[in-house]
Amino acid sequence: GVMMGPIMGPSLGAWLTETYSWHWVFFVNLPFGIITVAGLLIFMDETKLNTGLQFDWFGFTALAIGIGSLQLALDRGEQLDWLESWEIVIELIVSGTGFYYFFAHSFTTKRPFVQFAIFKDRNFATALIFMVVIGVVLFSTMALASPLFQNAYGYPILTAGLLLATRGGGTFMAMMMVSRLMSYFEARTLIATGLSLMAFTLYEMTGWTADVAVQTIVINSVVQGFGLGLVFVPLSTAAFMTLPNHLRTDGTSMLTVVRNVASSIGISIVIAQLTRGTTRVHAVLAEHINPFNNALQMPNVTSSINLNTDMGRATMD
């Protein structure tokens, strides 16, 4: 799933969007979910219940409210102009309150929902920091790739999906090789190599223009995905290398939560910057859109757009 998801996801999502509608990107998860649940019920052995272990419902509820409100604020913040909207302010207050009660309760109860002893392990704490960096930087960049390919480069939805899938192909190749490479190289060497590849490809993307070749995009995406594969497996291995067995369940869930929240924060930041940049550039260009601009008096412009009418100005805008 980790390897095939990044390959099949963009291609399948693009095909469903182009053939049916974007709603089917979500509907398609229903049959896969049913198959997964059925497989768990049929093939997975039942584990023994630990009756002496109580579930921390208060900590779970407080954390769910904190994370849920934060995610909602991050998703809707750009649409509602962030702190100018009372909805975003209320969501952030609810999120802060949820996190406050979660931490206050966790430090005072005997069996908290999350064992904070996991952060005392240096390898795990370091891996967590790297996960935050990857979530903020890489996944936010991936979120901008699809609108870049479609809006700026003019590729159809299906072509954009196939281009995004090449990154997953690079990750697939790296994960097939990394287990054998770990027999010859240290985990930190592979992680450093993977981060270097990702940094190089991201830097190369800053020089892309509207006429960038498809071959360049494919090579860049494959190398970037290969770098991610070199980082992901050794980083996960290093995170749990010295973590006690009874803390590994908490560690696994914490890595997943932190990566998802970090990616949401990163995506919100880049979308906010994109929106502000678009607004600023639009304002500069709009200053030159008037009937007295000589460039707009050319026959190929005046034949299709009349700037003296509201419809013409709206079309130009």
Protein language model annotation of sequence segments:
Residues 1-59, 169:
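Helix-loop-helix hairpins in multi-pass membrane proteins, especially solute transporters
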Residues 5, 170-174, 258, 262:
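MFS transmembrane alpha-helix packing/gate-lining sites
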